[in-house]
Amino acid sequence: MLALFLCVFLSLTSPIIMSWKQILKDYTYFLKIERALSVNSIKSYQLDIEKLIAYLEEYNIKASPITIGKDELTQFNYHIAKSLNARSQSRLISGLKGFFNYLIFEDYRLDNPMDTIESPKIGRKLPDTISTEDIDNLIAAIDYTKAEGERNKAILETLYGCGLRVSELTDLKLSDLYFKEGFIKVTGKGNKQRFVPITETTIDYINNYVYNSRLQLKINPDFSDILFLNRRGKQLTRAMIFTIIKQLAVKINLNKTISPHTFRHSFATHLLENGADLRAIQQMLGHESITTTEIYMHIDRTHLHTAINKFHPRS
């Protein structure tokens, strides 16, 4: 209760926005130390609260983290609904509920004003995928006269051949490669590690990059163990991977928007279509729950309908 008293006192004697920013700083520390979340997850939660702070500033609403109520937050919800789709809005609401639960946990508040605010109903969005032909065309479109050509080929093949998240790809280290055993060690969400099998094709592409163009780089000592590097010998960013893929998609006139995650979805879908066990796919993707992996069953049903229409004698 002392923390509650002090926070109310500070909210009356300090600038309201500063009190938001101080508590946001404390919350960020909590997410990092107590919950051990990844940098990207923490940034997402920060952005949720920063959007609320910006809204309060824009409309000159005098409310601190302690005094803000459901009326102000309901209006904020209406405000964000104008610019966010249902899925993004639902995620933001969930993030703010977590923030106010933290304030209750720290005795700053007695209630969660977000409890009465419902998330919009959203359907289960099926992942976007591309065909093996599309993937071959993307790889063929790489300019191998440039120094980064071999690297980009290895990147695309690793995304598709191992089903990695983009952050898992950029964090991949040379010391994570167990080619003799046919596996790579992947560090996923929550710093959880898993071993993912790797094909001979992907091994060849990575080795070609490692023992050729990568050797030509002046590698920054801080990134000597990082597999995929930029021209300056530093770790590639997630944004750069997105850019590489986007440029190749434009180059082959691919009539859909794709991202690094499209390769991960395609990896899982193509395995399932060709008879792979769902549990095995779950382990390779690093999903906590089989329910998350089951979404690929919905995609595969189209494939099953095609099969029965083509091969069943009564179709």
Regions found by a protein language model. Name each.
Residues 5-315:
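Conserved catalytic core of the tyrosine transesterase superfamily
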